[in-house]
């Protein structure tokens, strides 16, 4: 296990500052004037005579040059006043104390430093509304809902026309998102706003079929790698490149302390798989897990501010034999843990049996469910089998139970699925899970490319996002091979941002095409700097261009090294356009008529005889 250094020595330079060619801008609320919703604005060259392009921005204060970043104090808890003003929560008088097992019994130099800055810990007051779902059902528009509405509109005006030429497969995407529309979607369970009342640093966002497709990035330590510094750095790095949520999947020691540092410095929702930490508390012996340990872990993480829990309550005892003839069996870590527990005790999954108790704990802090697909296929050969869909149907049943308790729900999905089987996954989820948001890992469309699974999965992610999946969990090049580093995180995030945007474009999401059109015009007009800055990864685009044309003068040239100055199709197209524009209005028709007359004079023969 790594030696844990003091945070000031270990943290290094957290990536901060604006992205190239961009600036941080904010839009205030109308119902709640104090809210400030962030965007990334990219200005284009004055010759374009175009307004700046507004891009969705989950990077938080780290890209605001005026923000004071202090990792040891955490981000400003700007959402906390909204929670207090509602008057529906109370301070926890005696918060749960940190126990040795919370950090895997790490001691001395191996124990990660605690996050020591003090903060209040809240819990829902008895008989009061607590969750965004409960507020929505009561007809109350919260500050979080207006925040989401502003964010989704990307600063478009309500009466501004938009292009809607996609296929949305029955979704109900509006031309303009209002706070009332957000409320309605949350009330129906078609969207969630994952926002624990103890995550005051959060910038609210929505996950739902009728909103922009979101992406999640996974970080977390393991039994052999990573420190607090590594994980905070990966958090900031992932959000800088566009991660909308981050899951802390830590499985080694120091899980509690590392998670505290992550949440206190996170502007995006944080998700976890509580069974991982519960397993550490019983020394890694799945058979020793029990409700008391798991319940304690839920409360611990809820008080810290985790926004959504992956709970594998659908891995039921009767379903386990259905996996026996699979090529890759049970590949979900959480699913395999619960399957082992069920078989060892020959009992029903205690997460399933105690599900209503879990709901009551999560409701008290407004923690959302991410109902885990513990029986997801781990190979294309196993896709869409009875084990997978039996669990999915159970998750649909549990969704109704969670809604009854006022808890927000999304459903996790596969996995490894060949392209021709992807649509069936979306159809089955909509049918059995009552339109609760779908959250999928890819899916990977082929199993032949270790080291390139970010690509094999992005193919499936773009497709299932188009069909209706609300959030895509990224896959990095290290999938199946090792723990990703920061370069892998960047690659995974950017790959999935383009998959999500491709899905938005295909769905006909209003505003999606504006970004593409802006960069297309820049490309046609040889505005190289605009091309770089409007891209998902300006640094890489600029570096690739400069490998062969490094001089500054080349950034105004009307060609690149692919075609050179004589064969550039866009340059030739511009010349054709200019030539056509200079011709008399009837000259083209006149020329065509002359050629037609000549054709008839020659006997209207397609092939002329030669002497």
Curated annotation (Swiss-Prot):
An annotated GO cellular component of this protein is: cytosol
Q: Give the UniProt keywords, A-Z.
A: 4Fe-4S, Iron, Iron-sulfur, Lyase, Metal-binding, S-adenosyl-L-methionine, Thiamine biosynthesis, Zinc
Q: Which residues does the record give as substrate binding sites?
A: 218, 247, 276, 312, 332-334, 373-376, 412, 439
Q: Which Pfam families match?
A: ThiC-associated, ThiC_Rad_SAM
- Under Enzyme Commission nomenclature, its number is 4.1.99.17
GO molecular-function term, one example from the UniProt record: 4 iron, 4 sulfur cluster binding
Q: Which reaction does it catalyse?
A: 5-amino-1-(5-phospho-beta-D-ribosyl)imidazole + S-adenosyl-L-methionine = 4-amino-2-methyl-5-(phosphooxymethyl)pyrimidine + CO + 5'-deoxyadenosine + formate + L-methionine + 3 H(+)
Q: Which InterPro entries match?
A: ThiC, ThiC-associated_dom, ThiC/Bza_core_dom, ThiC/BzaA/B
Asked if the record carries the keyword Ubl conjugation, the reply is no
Q: Which residues form the signal peptide?
A: none
Q: Which cofactor(s) does the record list? A: [4Fe-4S] cluster
**Subunit details for this protein?**
Homodimer.
What functional role does this protein have?
Answer: Catalyzes the synthesis of the hydroxymethylpyrimidine phosphate (HMP-P) moiety of thiamine from aminoimidazole ribotide (AIR) in a radical S-adenosyl-L-methionine (SAM)-dependent reaction.
Listed name of the protein: Phosphomethylpyrimidine synthase
The organism named in the record is Caulobacter sp. (strain K31)
């Amino acid at each position: 296990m790594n030696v844990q250094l003091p945070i000031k020595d270990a943290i290094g330079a957290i990536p901060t500052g604006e992205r190239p060619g961009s600036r941080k801008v904010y839009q205030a609320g109308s119902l709640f004037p104090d809210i400030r919703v962030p965007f990334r604005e990219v200005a284009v060259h004055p010759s374009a005579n175009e307004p700046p392009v507004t891009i969705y921005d989950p990077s938080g204060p780290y890209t605001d040059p005026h923000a004071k970043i202090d990792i040891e104090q955490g981000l400003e808890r700007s959402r906390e006043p909204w929670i207090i003003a509602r008057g529906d929560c109370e301070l926890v008088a005696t918060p749960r104390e940190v126990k040795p097992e919370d950090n895997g019994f790490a001691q001395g130099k191996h124990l990660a430093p605690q996050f020591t800055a003090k903060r209040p810990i809240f819990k829902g007051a008895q008989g009061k509304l607590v969750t965004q779902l409960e507020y929505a059902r009561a007809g109350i528009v919260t500050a979080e809902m207006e925040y989401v509405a502003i964010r989704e509109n990307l600063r478009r005006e309500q009466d501004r026309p938009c292009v809607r030429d996609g296929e949305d497969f029955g979704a109900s995407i509006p031309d303009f998102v209002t706070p009332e529309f957000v409320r309605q979607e949350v009330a129906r369970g078609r969207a969630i706003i994952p926002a624990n009342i103890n995550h005051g640093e959060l910038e609210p966002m929505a996950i739902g079929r009728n909103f922009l497709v979101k992406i999640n990035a996974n970080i977390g330590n393991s039994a052999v790698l990573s420190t607090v510094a590594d994980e905070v750095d990966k958090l900031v790095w992932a959000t800088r490149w566009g991660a909308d949520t981050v899951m802390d999947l830590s499985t080694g020691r120091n899980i509690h302390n590392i998670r505290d540092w992550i949440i206190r410095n996170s502007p995006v929702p944080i998700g976890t798989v509580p069974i991982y930490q519960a397993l550490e508390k019983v020394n890694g012996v799945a058979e020793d897990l029990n409700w008391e340990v798991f319940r304690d872990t839920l409360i611990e993480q809820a008080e810290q501010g985790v926004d959504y829990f992956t709970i594998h309550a659908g891995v039921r005892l009767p379903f386990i034999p259905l996996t026996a003839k699979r090529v890759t069996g049970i590949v979900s870590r959480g699913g395999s843990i619960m399957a082992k527990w069920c078989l060892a005790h020959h009992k029903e999954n205690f997460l399933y049996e105690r599900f209503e108790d879990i709901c009551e704990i999560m409701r008290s802090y407004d923690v959302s469910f991410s109902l885990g697909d513990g029986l997801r296929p781990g190979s294309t050969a196993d896709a869409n089998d009875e084990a997978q869909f039996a669990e999915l149907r159970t998750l649909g049943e549990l969704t109704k139970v969670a809604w009854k308790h006022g808890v927000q729900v999304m459903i996790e999905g596969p996995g490894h699925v060949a392209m021709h089987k992807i649509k069936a996954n979306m159809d089955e989820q909509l049918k059995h899970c009552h339109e609760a948001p779908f959250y999928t890992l890819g899916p990977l469309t082929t199993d032949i490319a270790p080291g390139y699974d970010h690509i094999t999965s992005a193919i499936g992610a773009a497709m299932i996002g188009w069909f209706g999946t609300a959030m895509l969990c990224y896959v990095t090049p290290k999938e199946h091979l090792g723990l990703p580093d920061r370069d892998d995180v960047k690659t995974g995030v950017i790959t999935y941002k383009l998959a999500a945007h491709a899905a938005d474009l295909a769905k006909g999401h209003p505003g999606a095409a504006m970004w593409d059109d802006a960069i297309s015009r820049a490309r046609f007009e040889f505005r190289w700097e605009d091309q770089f800055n409007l891209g998902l990864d300006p640094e890489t685009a600029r570096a690739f261009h400069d490998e062969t044309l490094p001089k500054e003068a080349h950034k105004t040239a009307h060609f690149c090294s692919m075609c050179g100055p004589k064969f550039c199709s866009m340059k030739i197209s511009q010349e054709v356009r200019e030539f056509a524009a200079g011709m008399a209005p009837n000259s083209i028709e006149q020329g065509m008529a002359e050629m037609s007359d000549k054709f008839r004079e020659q006997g209207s023969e397609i092939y002329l005889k030669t002497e």
